[in-house]
């Protein structure tokens, strides 16, 4: 299963190769800079000391996606351990920490959801509170942050996760893997399927549904 492969990779080299900056610097100088290109990096867990290497006036990229503030609902190593909804206090805390961390170095690309995540409307808003007012409030919280808001397709109309009746209806291999992990951990098929509904990246890849 994919989880075991990732674990082996992390044990081998931490999941990230050292010295990537040499390649990224050359990429910027030879490909981006000659065209004065605006670039967005998909970068995780960059600490304060590394920020100026990655973004800003002399960074590898113009900006990067703000992943840190949207990770707090992910608990444990299995999706069945994740929180059902994003805790608003934790999200507020992480947004403030991230904004202060950036300081005057640069701005980030603020996101609520992307192609690898469940729908933001489902993560951030309890089912009983879903509606025009709550979706509008969520949008306001995103666009009023310092930075550049990035909207993923379907987010502009408040799309939610998509229910599926069986694991065979999912295409994403990591979802199938997590389903089996949940089953092996003692979850029923219904509970494992509920985890898939709440967290599968297939939610972001589905067509508009009613």
Language-model region placement:
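Active-site and adjacent substrate-binding regions of carbohydrate-active enzymes
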Residues: 1-208
């Amino acid at each position: 299963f994919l989880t075991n492969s990732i674990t082996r990779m992390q044990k081998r080299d931490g999941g990230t190769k050292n010295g990537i900056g040499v390649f990224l610097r050359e990429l910027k100088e030879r490909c981006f800079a000659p065209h004065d290109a605006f670039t967005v990096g998909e970068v995780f867990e960059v600490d304060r000391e590394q920020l100026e290497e990655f973004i800003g006036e002399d960074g590898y990229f113009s900006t990067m996606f703000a992943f840190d503030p949207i990770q707090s609902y992910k608990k444990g190593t299995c999706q069945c351990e994740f929180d059902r909804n994003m805790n608003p206090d934790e999200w507020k805390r992480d947004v403030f920490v991230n904004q202060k961390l950036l300081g005057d170095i640069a701005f980030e690309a603020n996101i609520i959801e992307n192609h690898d995540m469940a729908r933001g409307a489902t993560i951030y808003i309890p089912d009983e509170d879903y509606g025009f007012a709550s979706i509008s409030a969520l949008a306001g919280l995103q666009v009023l942050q310092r930075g550049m808001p990035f909207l993923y397709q379907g987010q502009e109309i408040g799309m939610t996760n998509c229910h599926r009746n069986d694991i065979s209806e999912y295409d994403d291999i990591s979802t199938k893997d997590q389903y089996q992990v949940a089953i092996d951990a003692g979850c029923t098929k219904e509970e494992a399927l509920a985890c898939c509904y709440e967290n599968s990246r297939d939610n972001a890849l589905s067509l508009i549904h009613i």
